[in-house]
């Protein structure tokens, strides 16, 4: 599993997917429940695609910044237009970033670390429309889809450079035994 690879070989950024909330990187969350659900879902998709029977794991890490490194950190609080634009921009194809002269993204790893709330499905749907040419970024009304319904989304911390990864220490790696507990809580965040 990827968790076992992290424990045995360290974090390798080449395995990151390209169009994530804060750009390609290694993502963590202080929410055990969210991490467990994400691990279960990812493992289920992997098993279905590859006809495997892997088990989901949670890797617990500790982050200790080294002050001499001068890490560039992006902070993006939820329910702000700045957060919405940044997350959307990271989900756009490079040709869209170029066509609309969008510079505020992290697909190039300009930020070593980013943190903020995890996006819901709304931004993914909007990015799909922008990438498909159905919507242009200037026409997006962020207030419309960043409604504050009182729901609190888990925080995420993402690491995008080797410099940032070097500050992470793996503490433990544990198999998730009670998968039903997390799958039954799907509606909750």
What positions do the PLM features span?
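Short consensus segments that form the blades of beta-propeller domains
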Residues: 16, 49-50
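Conserved NAD+-utilizing ADP-ribose enzyme module
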Residues: 20-21, 36, 41-48, 55, ...
């Amino acid at each position: 599993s990827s968790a076992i690879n992290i424990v045995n070989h360290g974090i390798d950024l080449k395995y990151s997917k390209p169009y994530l909330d804060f750009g390609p990187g290694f993502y963590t969350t202080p929410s055990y429940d969210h991490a467990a659900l994400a691990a279960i879902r990812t493992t289920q998709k992997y098993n279905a695609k590859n006809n495997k029977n892997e088990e989901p794991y949670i890797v617990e890490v500790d982050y200790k910044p080294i002050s001499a490194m001068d890490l560039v950190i992006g902070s993006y609080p939820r329910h702000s237009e700045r957060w919405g634009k940044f997350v959307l921009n990271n989900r756009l194809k490079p040709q869209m970033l170029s066509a609309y002269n969008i510079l505020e993204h992290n697909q190039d790893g300009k930020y070593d670390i980013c943190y903020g709330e995890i996006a819901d499905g709304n931004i993914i749907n909007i990015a799909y429309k922008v990438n498909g040419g159905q919507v242009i970024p200037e026409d997006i009304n962020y207030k419309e889809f960043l409604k504050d319904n009182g729901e609190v989304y888990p925080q995420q911390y993402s690491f995008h450079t080797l410099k940032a990864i070097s500050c992470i220490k793996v503490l433990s790696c544990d198999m998730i035994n009670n998968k039903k507990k997390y799958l039954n809580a799907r509606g909750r965040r």
